[in-house]
Amino acid sequence: MGKVASYVLFGAMAMQLWGTTRATRDIDILIDPTVENARRVLAALSETGLGLAAEWLADEVVSKPITVIGDAPRVDLFTVAWSVQYPEAAADAVTFDLEGVPIPTASIEHLIASKRTGRLQDAADIEVLEELRRLRSLP
């Protein structure tokens, strides 16, 4: 068996796994920004039906902060999620089980940090995440 792709789920899909009802049309994934890992991520996306992922070169993916793949669903591959780097996100990630598949998901703290963009929707998300953190009695 080959190596597994290294990633952490971010964005609204991560918020949903934490228990919010935030709607979204995309999947935000923070990846370990190495060429080898980007190859594994692109291969995994291709295997799951996102054939457009096969058209991207791993070198291209790691050379920029975000790569958008596909349309429905749209997958946004991040090499940095605003101020959050992969190593710190991976170290603090919480794994959720989604239909038998373990999904490494950004901590509430890292979700909040990734939402400090100044956009109105992100400001609203921060309020929801801070309330969720309070309800779960998380630091």
Task: Indicate residue ranges for each PLM-predicted region.
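Compositionally biased terminal segments of proteins
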Residues: M1-P139
